[in-house]
Amino acid sequence: MKQLLDFIPLIIFFALYKFYDIYVATGALIAATTLQVIVTYAMYKKVEKMQLITFVMVALFGGMTLALHDDNFIKWKVTIVYVVFALGLTISQIMGKPAIKGMLGKELTLPDAVWSTINWAWVMFFSGCAALNLYVAYHLPLDVWVNFKVFGLLAATFVFTLLTGGYIYKHLPHEPKQKNQ
């Protein structure tokens, strides 16, 4: 249910962009993200840091997009969110407490070197997405950027999550196989 809530603002943004324009879609994104945070808090009595950062960035850059009638701000929001995530993971790594381990370490037992590798991999992923977003936003038409934001980045995140899962699985402690007697 929680994951479904994460996609609703994105779906609304995409649909309203296709039927109207970037400004209607941005206004709806701000409203949907605000509602998403409220519903998440009402249901779980907690809002994750990543969701809160995304909400603040949507409100700030979406608001600037609407106030100044300039779609560059909503384009920048995507890059800035990814840069903030990459910096957060980098700082956590430098401090010796990989954030990825903090998020998943209660459920998974892995060596510190594996957590470190996963953390750095996500730093690189978020940094790459930030750079790629800038390229698409400023070298391709707005329609292409919206599709990239909604489908391209979502697909890339899904694939990278699967790859991370495979890497984690490879390093999980496995029970020795018992021989049939």
Swiss-Prot record:
Q: Mind telling me which InterPro entries this protein's record contains?
A: YciB (IPR006008)
**Membrane topology, as annotated:** Multi-pass membrane protein
Keywords for this entry? Cell inner membrane, Cell membrane, Membrane, Transmembrane, Transmembrane helix
TM annotation in the entry = 10-30, 50-70, 80-100, 120-140, 148-168
The listed locations are:
Cell inner membrane
Q: Which GO terms describe its cellular component?
A: plasma membrane
Pfam families listed in its UniProt record:
IspA
Domain of life according to the entry = Bacteria
Give yes or no: UniProt keyword Cytoplasm.
Answer: no
Q: Summarize the protein's role.
A: Plays a role in cell envelope biogenesis, maintenance of cell envelope integrity and membrane homeostasis.
Q: Which family does this protein fall into?
A: Belongs to the YciB family.
- PANTHER family assigned to the protein according to its UniProt record, in alphabetical order: INNER MEMBRANE-SPANNING PROTEIN YCIB, INTRACELLULAR SEPTATION PROTEIN A-RELATED
- Please report the name of this protein according to its UniProt entry: Inner membrane-spanning protein YciB
- What is the source species? Vibrio cholerae serotype O1 (strain ATCC 39541 / Classical Ogawa 395 / O395)
